[in-house]
A protein has these predicted regions:
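Alpha-helical transmembrane segments of multi-pass integral membrane proteins
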Residues: 97-159
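Alpha-helical transmembrane segments of multi-pass membrane proteins
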Residues: 15-31
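Non-coiled-coil alpha-helical tracts in long, low-complexity regions of eukaryotic assembly proteins
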Residues: 31, 54-58, 62, 76-77, ...
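Alpha-helical transmembrane segments and their helix-start/interface "positive-inside/aromatic belt" motifs
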Residues: 1-14, 80-90
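Cytoplasmic juxtamembrane regions at transmembrane-helix boundaries
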Residues: 71-94, 152-159
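Peri-membrane helix termini and adjoining interfacial loops of integral membrane proteins
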Residues: 30-41, 105-114
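Interfacial helix-start motif at the membrane-water boundary
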Residues: 41-64
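Helical transmembrane-bundle signal
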Residues: 10-20, 62-72, 93-100, 131-141
Length: 159
């Protein structure tokens, strides 16, 4: 049901993560190539082997979160399953926030220097904020789904 506020939060979060994944993938991989070549990681193959699956997971995590948020909109009649899917996407989104902090800590200055215009640099800074906004939206949707479920349960008790 799209008229419910939690569905709008989930749809907005899904859209933001899809845009984040689609437009940011090229710059994301560019930043990971920079992180792999940092001086304190040079010659340490074990850390590089750890980074390779991390690169794969974090490049497709926004797409996964986007799909989960979109799918959970259609579980409006099965609230427990909707809450479960939202919680999974919330935890993935929280991990994405931690990864964003770690990623941009090492590569922000380099990526900002690669941006061809000031507009693209502003878009880079918006990409930093995007996972945090989406995490808040997913949290709010979980809160409103629980509130909706409590309302339905209280009406069932009255009958």
């Amino acid at each position: 049901m799209i008229q419910r506020i939690q569905s709008l939060f989930l749809l907005l979060s899904s859209t933001l993560y899809l845009v984040y994944w689609y437009y940011g993938l090229e710059w994301y991989l560019e930043g990971f190539n920079l992180i792999k070549n940092l001086p304190f990681l040079a010659g340490k193959n074990t850390i590089l082997y750890i980074l390779d699956p991390l690169i794969f997971i974090t490049t497709y995590a926004p797409l996964t979160i986007s799909i989960l948020c979109f799918i959970s909109i259609f579980f409006f009649k099965i609230r427990r399953r909707q809450i479960l899917i939202c919680k999974i996407s919330y935890y993935l989104s929280f991990l994405m926030c931690m990864n964003t902090v770690w990623f941009f800590y090492f590569s922000l200055n380099y990526l900002a220097s690669l941006m061809p215009s000031m507009f693209m640099e502003i878009m880079l800074y918006l990409a930093i904020i995007n996972p945090f906004i989406c995490t808040i939206l997913i949290y709010l949707s979980i809160k409103f789904i629980k509130k909706d479920s409590d309302l339905v349960n209280s009406l069932n008790r009255i009958r």
